[in-house]
Amino acid sequence: MVNTDNKENEPPNMEKAHMDSSNALYRVQRPLQRRPLQELSIELVKPSQTITVKKSKKSTNSSSYFAQLHAASGQNPPPSVHSSHKQPSKARSPNPLLSMR
């Protein structure tokens, strides 16, 4: 009878210990989950700004690299591609204005 009492008493004690530990872990995990999200959002914003600056500075390097890719693929060189991209963007700006009027 003593053995059965011990066995019956052990599972609730173990469950209570698990409940306490899970609550403690849950309490610890919540702030840990919140903090990295804020830090990550800040970290993700900063590199994007530095990358845009790098792109503007290295535009000649990237264009030469793309020129090699376009030459290899047999498409038009990048200057004509860039000019064609600029023209539609100018044509697109009046279109929304006309459609809104």
Swiss-Prot record:
One CC-aspect GO term: cytosol
Induction details: Preferentially expressed under nitrogen starvation conditions.
Cellular compartment(s): Cytoplasm; Nucleus
Molecular function per GO: ubiquitin ligase inhibitor activity
Region Disordered, annotated ranges: 1-101
The entry's keywords: Cytoplasm, Meiosis, Nucleus
First-listed, main subcellular location of the protein, grouped into a coarse class: cytoplasm
Keyword Nuclease: no
Compositional bias segments (type: Basic and acidic residues): 1-19
One GO process term, biological-process aspect: negative regulation of metaphase/anaphase transition of meiotic cell cycle
Function (record text): Specifically required for meiosis II (MII). Binds to slp1, an activator of the anapahase promoting complex/cyclcosome (APC/C), and counteracts its function in promoting proteolysis of cdc13. By suppressing the degradation of cdc13 at anaphase I this protein may help maintain a sufficient level of cdc2 kinase activity to complete MII.
Note: Expression of the full-length mes1 protein requires the presence of the mei2 protein.
Assembly and oligomerization: Interacts with slp1.
Protein name: Protein mes1
Source organism: Schizosaccharomyces pombe (strain 972 / ATCC 24843)
